[in-house]
């Protein structure tokens, strides 16, 4: 026994028990009335059915009594075995269990007890329900509904359509300055574009340019407007807006920034690095450097390229020289790759970006992806570092903050970013890395806010491009390429693979097969070898060039009539840049993609979602390849031997 008795307040529970008893009595009276009503309406049962019902009721009563006796015995045994200290808690738990709703078995037992009482008060010989099981089920339903009447039943809600969440883009992204896609029908004479100086107009005519493409006609005046007040200040003394350009490959983006930058720097007096163009590959940097050199020829402006093709010391000499113990810049415009640029910022003390006015980022989507090198943050740090200058220096630069009267006095040289890409991202996390200032977007598509389901990247396909996909098996891919070159005469053709090893194996296979000149273009080759290969391909000496994505990104290769995706690209950006090597400057071009059966569904959906004007199916009948199969099998055996020998050489 417990040492102290604890009287617990159980008033609410006792009140609930009394309420339940009164409720059951009312329900019993209601059931009796229903039995009388049904007895008057239904047809009287036969004596045999009545006997069966009576036997069924007695059987259930005996079964119920047996269960009750067993339960009492178990309870008595459990009470004897329990500790005295647990008696108070167990009694409270028993009372709490009474609050639970009645189970269906208990309800049926109550119905049977009510029926036995009804037999005494109701004439059994009268008509009863047609089925005792149906009668019990109805009673059970009534009892359960009455026992749960105190609880609020949830449900009955109308299904509503889920409202889609629309992306909310910044105004500069959602409302860009629209550029016409059709190049041929929107050519503008160079004399009609305002702001270009006569010297550059003559230079353009000398280089055979009589008209500007739509991108050039829109972007050149916008950049020239930002330098209308000179290099030291922006329009009205404010910092100029950054410029972003999203246009198809081959639409003339390079000339769109070369012309205004050269004109803006043509009036400079002291030579300093005032324009920096950063590009992802050495070949693309070489191409941009050549364009800058073509339009600075005959002027005092100097263009220097730092991509690692020369030694670090040679590049250091080209960038600056020491005269009278003082370092002097030898470059006005620097064209660089990110890795080499970071090397000069950290290791070349005479390399200064303190006077930088234009930061040009070409192939901006790929440059954003390479931010892990932190090249942009290091460039910004180098621009606003002022070693050896006092706080009262006229040309000192500080990191720009909020626009206030104090921050604008005294004025400082602004840094303007110029971004160019065929696949400009709309991902806010990536754009945040660029730290753009009130950017102005020039795009060949309209606002994207009307289509919230569209991806976060905007893609532009060349106007004259015809796209096809070729269903095939893995073993038939080389045969189809040979069929295209030898039978259909699709040349010059640029073929893309997903790996450097794949490009090399395909190159060896086509070379062993014979009948067509082939070359490979990958990072495996030296810069000199790649430059020579490109020149031979442009001259028509090589009808088939097999390349990787990294090597050919953004390069303007003249005369490419056909692009073949030997390996299907995994990402839409890769596909856009591959097919962008043809159909450039408004010309026509073909693009073929070899697809395995498992790749078709995903690839076609990816291209369709990106806004492709339409990709068609191109069948290659097996009969067209049979004549080459015997020679192809011999070549495969030879290829296996050559690859094995090359792998053995790599080990030693």
Swiss-Prot record:
UniProt keyword annotations, A-Z: ATP-binding, Helicase, Hydrolase, Nucleotide-binding, Nucleus, Ribosome biogenesis, RNA-binding, rRNA processing
Compartment(s): Nucleus, Nucleolus
Reactions this protein catalyses: ATP + H2O = ADP + phosphate + H(+)
EC class: hydrolase
The keyword Signal appears for this protein: no
Cellular component annotations (GO), alphabetically ordered: nucleolus; nucleus
UniProt biased composition (Low complexity): 25-34
GO biological process: one example: rRNA processing
Biased composition (Basic and acidic residues): 66-77, 107-122
GO MF term set: ATP binding; ATP hydrolysis activity; RNA binding; RNA helicase activity
One matching Pfam family: DEAD
Role played: ATP-binding RNA helicase involved in the biogenesis of 60S ribosomal subunits.
Family under the similarity heading: Belongs to the DEAD box helicase family. DDX51/DBP6 subfamily.
Protein name: ATP-dependent RNA helicase DDX51
Organism for this UniProt entry: Danio rerio
Lineage, top ranks: Eukaryota, Metazoa, Chordata, Craniata, Vertebrata
């Amino acid at each position: 026994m417990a040492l102290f008795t604890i009287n617990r307040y159980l008033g609410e529970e006792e009140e609930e028990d009394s309420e339940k008893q009164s409720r059951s009595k009312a329900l019993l009276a209601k059931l009796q009335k229903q039995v009388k009503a049904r007895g008057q309406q239904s047809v009287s049962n036969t004596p045999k059915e009545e006997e069966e019902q009576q036997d069924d009721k007695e059987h259930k009563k005996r079964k119920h009594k047996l269960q009750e006796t067993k339960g009492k015995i178990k309870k008595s045994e459990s009470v004897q075995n329990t500790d005295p200290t647990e008696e108070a808690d167990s009694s409270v738990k028993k009372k709490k269990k009474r609050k639970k709703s009645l189970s269906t078995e208990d309800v049926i037992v109550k119905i049977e007890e009510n029926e036995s009482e009804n037999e005494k008060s109701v004439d059994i010989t009268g008509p009863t329900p047609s089925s005792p099981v149906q009668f019990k089920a109805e009673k059970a339903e009534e009892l359960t509904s009455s026992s749960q009447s105190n609880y609020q039943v949830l449900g009955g809600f109308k299904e509503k359509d889920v409202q889609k969440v629309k992306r909310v883009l910044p105004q500069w992204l959602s409302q860009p300055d629209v550029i016409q896609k059709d190049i041929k029908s929107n050519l503008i004479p160079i004399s009609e574009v305002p702001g270009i100086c006569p010297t550059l107009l003559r230079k353009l005519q000398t280089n055979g340019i009589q008209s500007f493409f739509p991108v050039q006609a829109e972007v050149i005046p916008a950049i020239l407007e930002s330098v209308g007040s000179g290099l030291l200040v922006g329009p009205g003394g404010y910092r100029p807006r950054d410029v972003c350009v999203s246009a198809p490959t081959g639409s003339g983006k390079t000339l769109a920034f070369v012309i205004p930058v050269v004109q803006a720097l043509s009036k400079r007096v002291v030579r300093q690095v005032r324009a920096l163009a950063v590009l992802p590959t050495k070949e693309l940097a070489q191409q941009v450097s050549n364009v800058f050199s073509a339009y600075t020829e005959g002027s005092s402006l100097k263009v220097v390229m730092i991509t690692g093709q020369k030694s670090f010391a040679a590049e250091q000499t080209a960038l600056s020289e020491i005269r009278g113990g003082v370092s002097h810049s030898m470059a006005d415009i620097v064209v660089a790759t990110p890795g080499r640029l970071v090397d000069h910022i950290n290791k070349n003390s005479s390399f200064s970006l303190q006077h930088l006015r234009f930061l040009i980022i070409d192939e901006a989507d790929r440059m954003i992806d390479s931010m892990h090198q932190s090249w942009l943050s290091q460039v910004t740090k180098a621009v606003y570092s002022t070693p050896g200058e006092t706080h009262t220096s006229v040309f000192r630069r500080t990191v720009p903050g909020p626009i206030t009267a104090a921050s604008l006095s005294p004025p400082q040289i602004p840094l303007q970013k110029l971004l160019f890409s065929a696949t400009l991202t709309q991902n806010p996390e990536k754009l945040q890395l660029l730290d753009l200032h009130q950017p102005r977007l020039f795009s060949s598509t309209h606002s994207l806010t009307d289509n919230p389901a569209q991806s976060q990247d905007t893609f532009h396909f060349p106007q004259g491009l015809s796209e096809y996909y070729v269903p095939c098996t893995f073993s038939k891919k080389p045969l189809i390429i040979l069929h295209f070159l030898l039978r259909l005469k699709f040349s010059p053709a640029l073929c893309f693979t997903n790996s450097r090893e794949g490009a090399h194996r395909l190159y060896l296979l086509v070379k062993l097969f014979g009948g067509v000149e082939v070359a490979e273009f990958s990072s495996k080759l030296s810069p000199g070898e790649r430059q020579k290969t490109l020149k031979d391909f442009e001259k028509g000496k090589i009808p088939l060039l097999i390349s990787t994505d990294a090597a050919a990104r953004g390069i303007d290769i003249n005369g490419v009539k056909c692009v073949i995706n030997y390996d299907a690209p995994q990402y839409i950006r890769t596909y856009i840049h591959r097919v962008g090597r043809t159909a450039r400057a408004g010309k026509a071009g073909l693009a073929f993609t070899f697809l395995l059966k498992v790749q078709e569904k995903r690839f076609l959906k990816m291209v369709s979602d990106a806004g492709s004007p339409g990709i068609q199916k191109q069948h290659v009948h097996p009969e067209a390849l049979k004549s080459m199969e015997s020679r192809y099998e011999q070549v495969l055996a030879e290829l296996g031997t050559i690859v094995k020998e090359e792998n053995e050489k790599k080990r030693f």
